[in-house]
């Protein structure tokens, strides 16, 4: 199992993104040359450089993470291709896959109607992420799940409409018209003060992936580590994460999807989930 205490270390890669991308550029030239010699088609696979443990760059400047590891297993099943792994930013990945700069992208992404208009989503997911709510520890005895939160009339930190989490809450409200959660739209995708707002009582909960809570509250040297006794987290559900494929690469998308399906049946994805997360994330999906 990958150590969560390494999250802070991986976050430092954000500041070194320029160095990482420069190194990736050199590697890209070498990969293209190698593929040309072997007759294989190069597939550019972009991934976020610092989203530990999904997609990141390790201490040796090598692409790593659950989704990268799964894609490397996919590559083994597709000998006609040579995958070139390119660490990059979220924005460059999304724009790059849409424009064709990259063929595939991985960033722990969920499927939404808006995204399906821009990218091909393989039928088989590549992983999963757990989403839930950070609340004050003093509320933990009465609020144990999202239904409790909603029925108590608690307020969530605002969520940007373009954030997939906004759709998750919208779907919850549609399924629970008798006690919907008040959903306030934010102009900003990331809310830097979210944990502070919960601590202060300005809002009662922060709806985010479990990884965010671990990185910001429970990990070693976490920004809000001094408040870990005042905050707690409950899970709502797990959502499948997918590889994004450029809209024109229909054949590639079908081949990747088939490979992912085979890896699931073989138990390889479950094995990698245990390695990077310590549990089988797909089992959480089955419980929903």
Question: What positions do the PLM features span?
Answer:
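Bilobed "Venus flytrap"/periplasmic-binding protein-like clamshell domains
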Residues: 49-52, 63-75, 132-190, 210-212
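Periplasmic-binding protein-like
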Residues: 49, 127-132, 220-257, 279-288
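Ligand-binding clefts/hinges and TM-proximal coupling segments of bilobed small-molecule sensing domains
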Residues: 32, 81-84, 161-184, 258-288
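A ligand-binding cleft/hinge motif common to bilobed small-molecule-binding domains
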Residues: 108-118, 167-171, 199-237
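Extracytoplasmic small-molecule ligand-binding "clamshell" domains
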Residues: 35-109
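Extended ligand-binding regions for polar small-molecule ligands
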Residues: 68-78, 137-140, 147-150, 154-160, ...
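Acidic, polar ligand-binding/catalytic clefts
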Residues: 84-149
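Short helix-initiation/N-cap motifs at beta->coil->alpha
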Residues: 84-95, 183-196, 200
């Amino acid at each position: 199992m990958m150590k969560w205490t390494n999250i802070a270390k991986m976050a430092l890669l954000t500041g070194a993104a320029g160095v990482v991308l420069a190194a990736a550029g050199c590697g890209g030239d070498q990969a293209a040359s190698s593929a040309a010699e072997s007759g294989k088609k190069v597939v550019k696979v972009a991934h976020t450089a610092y989203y530990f443990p999904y997609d990141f760059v390790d201490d040796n400047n090598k692409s790593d993470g659950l989704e990268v590891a799964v894609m490397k297993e996919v590559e083994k099943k597709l000998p006609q291709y040579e995958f070139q792994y390119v660490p990059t930013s979220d924005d460059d990945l999304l724009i790059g896959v849409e424009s064709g700069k990259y063929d595939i992208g991985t960033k722990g992404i969920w499927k939404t109607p808006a995204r399906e208009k821009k990218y091909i989503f393989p039928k088989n997911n590549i992983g999963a992420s757990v989403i839930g709510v950070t609340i004050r520890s003093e509320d933990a005895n009465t609020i144990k799940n999202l239904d409790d939160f909603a029925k108590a009339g608690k307020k969530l930190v605002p969520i940007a409409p373009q954030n997939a989490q906004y759709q998750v809450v919208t779907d919850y409200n549609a399924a629970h018209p008798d006690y919907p959660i008040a959903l306030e739209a934010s102009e900003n995708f990331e809310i830097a003060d979210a944990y502070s707002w919960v601590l202060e009582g300005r809002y009662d909960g922060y709806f985010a992936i479990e990884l965010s809570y671990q990185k910001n509250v429970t990990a070693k040297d976490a920004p809000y580590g001094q408040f870990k006794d005042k905050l707690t987290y409950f899970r709502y559900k797990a959502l499948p994460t997918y590889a994004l494929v450029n809209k024109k690469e229909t054949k590639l998308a079908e081949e990747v999807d088939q490979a992912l399906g085979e890896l699931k049946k073989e138990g390889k994805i479950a094995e990698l989930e245990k390695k990077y997360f310590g549990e089988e994330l797909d089992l959480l999906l089955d419980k929903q």
